[in-house]
């Protein structure tokens, strides 16, 4: 473990020498990863590398950029938020992603979670029910060079059957049940993570693994607070 930590520290030091002149938020990003992500128990090196690389400040409004690397959610408009960095890392690590995976994200929001996924897997398919957010996130991701992310304006409850099955599904809005269409689009052996429970207060971060024959293994990971899933989810 000591070798891994030293190597990671060296990577950040090298990045600082090469990029500090062009990235005024580099030091804050390094501190975020060191203190709020690795410091709180995230061990997956690929998650750490992705979040050390991605300019989170470009996924929030200009007036919030100084706060972009604080371990807190921030508003992005239309009553939505960019998730707390630690929660992004926790959910991503729990999926145990592999480089060749194809991942479905429900709730594109700012596009930050999609960018983290895109650094780690082959393809990301992300659905956003709010048109303005979908278009803004799609434009931002393209400008940052992410060619392996497809953003769709639509109701994420229904998934994206044309590209199913998926190795993993991540839901970034609270819902009081596991959407059946998303379970159907999850590969056998695949993992789905979501904030499950009341859409008014706190939810339980829940990891679901689809076993052979469609059986589900469910693991509860602690309390979280997410904005509610809208659209079809509210009718159920």
Swiss-Prot record:
Cellular component terms per the entry's GO annotation: cytoplasm
Record key words, sorted: Cytoplasm, Methyltransferase, S-adenosyl-L-methionine, Transferase
Reaction(s) this enzyme catalyzes, per UniProt: [protein]-L-isoaspartate + S-adenosyl-L-methionine = [protein]-L-isoaspartate alpha-methyl ester + S-adenosyl-L-homocysteine
Primary localisation category: cytoplasm
Record-linked InterPro entries: PCMT, SAM-dependent_MTases_sf
Residues spanning the signal sequence: none
Catalytic EC class: transferase
PANTHER family in the record: PROTEIN-L-ISOASPARTATE O-METHYLTRANSFERASE, PROTEIN-L-ISOASPARTATE(D-ASPARTATE) O-METHYLTRANSFERASE
Descriptive protein name: Protein-L-isoaspartate O-methyltransferase 3
